[in-house]
Curated annotation (Swiss-Prot):
UniProt protein name: Large ribosomal subunit protein uL30
Assembly and binders: Part of the 50S ribosomal subunit.
Keyword field: Ribonucleoprotein, Ribosomal protein
Record gene name: rpmD
Family per similarity comment: Belongs to the universal ribosomal protein uL30 family.
GO function term, MF aspect, one: structural constituent of ribosome
Length: 63
């Protein structure tokens, strides 16, 4: 399964609580935190909701 790297690049201060909760659900707490998540539609939907706060990169599959 493909993986994606998500980095929080902008502080969620001043944004709505649902966006802050989405970041917490992704595992992002502080600016420049990085998490690796599976590339599935549910995660992509959460990324779309906070796309103005995060940077997303696809990771190469290792076999």
């Amino acid at each position: 399964m493909a993986k994606i790297k998500i980095e929080l690049v902008k502080s969620p201060i001043g944004y709505k609580y649902d966006q802050r909760d989405t970041l917490k659900a992704l595992g992002l707490r502080k600016v420049h935190d990085v998490v690796i998540q599976p590339d599935i539609p549910q995660i992509r939907g959460m990324i779309n909701k906070v796309r103005h706060l995060v940077l997303v990169k696809a990771l190469e599959e290792e076999e």
